[in-house]
Amino acid sequence: MELKKIYTGLNAQEVAENRKKYGENLLTPPAQIPLWKRFITKFKDPLIIILLVAGVLSIAISFYEYHGLHEGTEVFFEPVGIFIAILLAIGMAFFFEEKANRAFAILNQVDDDEPVEVIRDGNPKKIAKRDIVVDDIVLLNTGAEAPADGKLLEAISLHIDESTLTGEPICHKSTHEEDFDKDATFPSDYVLRGTKVMEGHGVFRVEKVGDNTENGKVFVASQIDNSVKTPLTEQLERLGNLITWSSYTIAVIILIARIAMFFLSYDFTWVHFLQYLLDSIMICVTLIVVAVPEGLPMAVTLSLAYSMRRMLKTNNLVRKMHACETMGATTVICTDKTGTLTQNQMRVYKIEVDCSSEEHKALAKEGIAVNSTASLDLSDAQHPTVLGNPTEGALLLWLHEKGYDYRQLRADVEIIDELPFSTERKCMGTLVRSGLLPGKTILYIKGATDIIRYYCSDIMGDRSWDDITAQLLKWQNQAMRTLGFACMIIPDSSEFKLHEGVISQILDSIKDGNNGLTFQGIVAIADPVRKEVPDAVRECLDAGIDVKIVTGDTPGTAKEIGRQVGIWTEKDCDRCVITGSEFEALSDKELSERVNSLKIIARARPMDKKRLVEALQAKHHVVAVTGDGTNDAPALKAAHVGLSMGDGTSVAKEASDITIIDNSFSSIGRAVMWGRSLYQNIQRFILFQMTVNVAACLIVLAGALLGTQSPLTVTQMLWVNLIMDTFAAMALASLPPSEAVMQNKPRDRKAFIINPSMSRQIIGVGGLFFILLLGLLYMLEYAPINSMTDLLTWHSTGPRELTNHELSIFFTVFVMLQFWNMFNARAFATGKSTFHFKDCKGFGIIVLVIFIGQIIIVQFGGKMFNVTPLCLTDWIAIIVVTSLVLWVGELLRLINRK
């Protein structure tokens, strides 16, 4: 690099002093939580805490029964089952989250040993990026990455890609105040750590290093844990509190009622009373244990784990398990523009260059190929990538798509002179001996159309300047970049000597278009919207989710992109868009008043999106944020769900909860659908298990008040718990997502997970089960029943002990009621028949396992399960009678559909 000035830079002593005073050029890595702490954190789940309490109480009961009542070791099955349920739920959640974390590369690793060219002691030298200190003089060349923040001392045709910090891919940098872009996010004479030089070169003095750089501030902010509670966590806490206080209330009622019954029925003696009181307390503790849905944590974990695995197939790599469900509660998505809504690759929108003759066609394609500093990486011919200026690269991509090899076109010419682009001249030129028109020397120029027009004396084709101006205005109103092309065939008799510097002489000789070039045409270049984005945005809007754009681009460009994807409409006013500087100037109160109506923040600074997220959260929105740049990291971390793009920066991925592998906005709609369906699956499990729990609690309550013992043995209850917990969780968690959920508005995050419809079903069906089971128990106790058909001719013969056959009938009826009710739970909130089995293979297999398992236990369980085999008639009668639960449910669903 040729320097305009002589710089001495720092000496060794100054380097040491500045390093001590301002710190090293290193980003503080995020604190890593030890593995054991991450595991222990799982025990903070409210339902897990309730289960732990229930497990301890269950152990106390078991020890009392084993040592005090001299019962067998089977009394320990219940507490063992509870702790197994706890370990399964925690273990699965921990395993899947750790597996997802390992699926991420080391995302926030920064190469601090990358060499950087600086001037020290008056000499250029290369040092490691980590060794840069404040006041170092750094040399920037094309392709280099700025190692720190600083102020430019020199800038020659310097263009920098700031997309990782502002979302803006190309920013012109200058040291001349008249060339400054007043609307730019950062000053035009300032460079930022992590940004890349796309064109030109420059020199800057370092002002900030490490965590003090803009990149560093974003990196540090992205590590802040805001401890935002997910909607599901809030709901499970409420459910846990409801179960806890309900069971405690019923337990107190039982204790008071039994004490009252004691004084009404027995003569008081302290020994007798204490024994009775201890028995009553054991019954109360049993009820509390029965009331706890120990399968719920496992059901939630299974649902989340299943969704994580299936969402990966739809290009959503979920890192944090609860993010699956939180997507379903999302009310607002804040997205950046570049790379998320658009392709982040400049492409030719339309080109209008005269090709009416073979010569004109040759001039057009040769001019595009040779008058360019960009090139293409064609290692993947189907997906070429641009190297160099994105705008020039777009023209080469257009040539490539038309089947022309720009490399061959360049190889066939002899370049005589080149005029690089400059902000002063606003055009560039190349003088060549043509390969397509042998023997001719041609000057090609391109640049701002008004500048190119100045140098032209005529136009190719039959278009007028008015036509061209009208077309340019139309494109510019669509926020597109426009360029003009012109050429001149230099005659052999030309007065100019063909050597380096001749292009400037030719252009300077042209006065007001006299003896000028021939205008070839114009081109519109834009970063096109991804094809799938408009439909994806429409899907989100139809689902009641607002989408807001936060970008470093201009308001005009942002509004045009918003219009193309369906976010910005004709009804929207200026109040719906704001610039970063205006946004920063808003007070918290003013922001609170405007935040719901804002649709676009243009020229946004790195921390603007984070402030927007926090303002939306203060308005009780559930916020998801998409982003691919380092500038997005704080907002990704602060949001309820952070969605990074697969080709985003490592800092963005580290801060996110979900990575969209294919960078497609449409994958976000799939994630919302999975989240909403997952929440419904959890509701279905709660509906199923709470119905069983209500029936079980009422049976314990009735038994306590009537003085009867439970007709179900410990081993039978273990099988019932296995059905209620593991099998039901697996069956209902594996239900596929429903497209229908995308027609609904987002649920109110404050609305209880047990909605009124569920409450009615839980109390109604649970109460009905209790009445049926209590009635059956009464009939079995007051008359000998050798077959189910005996119930048709039943008459009371007085109370007696139940036989094993009668206990087997009661046990099977109890299980089959739950079996059929599982079908009702599956159909909840679908609006369809329970026999709609599409994509429900897992559910079908599990209910078949339950049914076959019940038959095997009853027919072959013997003493272990305290059962005797039932005849075929009994089985048919039990199946038919208990299936009424399903048929009544189907009838009610049919009525509701009509």
Which role fits each region the language model picked out?
Residues 748-768, 797-809, 837:
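Membrane-water interface at loop-to-transmembrane-helix junctions
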Residues 704-713, 779-805:
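Helix-coil boundary and interhelical linker segments in multi-pass alpha-helical membrane proteins
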Residues 724, 805-822, 847:
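Generic alpha-helical transmembrane segments
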Residues 1-746, 751-754, 811, 828-898:
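Conserved cytosolic headpiece of P-type ATPases
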Residues 259-267, 774-791, 859-862:
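Membrane-helix interface motif
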Residues 692-696, 764-773:
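Core segments of transmembrane alpha-helices
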Residues 620, 672, 676, 771-783, ...:
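Alpha-helix capping/termination and helix-coil
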